[in-house]
């Protein structure tokens, strides 16, 4: 549920911190933090959020690999990677029973493989996992991405238009009976309880950080940010969505692709915060 989603997300920053510590040479503390918070993430039992942040980890690993290649420190990189792999396995092993039963149960649900043979357009759906239409039902609109900067760019939440004092102050009283059946939101999603908004000032600091912050963390955060935004478009950008549904393991097990914007809500403020650290080309 949504409560466990927030609890899982709360364990993401210290997990990332453990990974960064390991690649900075602090193998013991990096390994301990990673093992502990990977275990707590999985215990929180919102696999979708942990799955999404696995992509963020890949961006971090890729950025540190590029740095190690460039600075000829590959042995240290592989040593840190080995420690992190062991730490992740420890965290997973602590939850192996729960993970196994979730996996076994999912095969008997709508996320498992259908026993029916489909033809025509229906055959284009996934052979196992959720249907494409269901996966992408909650897809963020391409222009709706501007809500990161302007929260009500698409009207805000799916509340009745009649509840907006601003709108009603300019509305024609002749059509007052219609306003209760119209929603303030006019984006591509079926409905929403509110936009994804990170703040104009935070977004300004993020853009500034793209030019000022040095080191591999910056490139990992920038890459993960744009990755999450493009994937959140779902049915509005099907070439990439189709690729992930067809070829990326487990991606077709999760619905509401717009929720991957939790990555951007993590990476944008983090890069903004890095502006307040002492400038150093090392990290």
Predicted regions and their residues:
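Membrane-interface transmembrane helices that cradle and orient dolichyl/undecaprenyl
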Residues: 15-31, 62-71
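Hydrophobic alpha-helical membrane-interfacial segments at the cytosolic entry of transmembrane helices
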Residues: 76-103, 119-124, 225-227
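Periplasmic/ER-lumenal interhelical loops and adjacent helix-loop junctions
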Residues: 97-209
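Membrane-interface helix-loop-helix junctions at transmembrane boundaries of multi-pass membrane enzymes
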Residues: 69-82, 166-180, 205-235
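Conserved small/polar residues in nucleotide/adenosyl-binding loops
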Residues: 276-283
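Membrane-helix boundary/interfacial segments in multi-pass membrane proteins
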Residues: 1-7, 183-196, 226-267
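Membrane-interface alpha helices of multi-pass inner-membrane proteins
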Residues: 18, 31-46, 87-93, 227
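Short hydrophobic alpha-helices at membrane interfaces in multi-pass membrane enzymes
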Residues: 24-39, 74-85
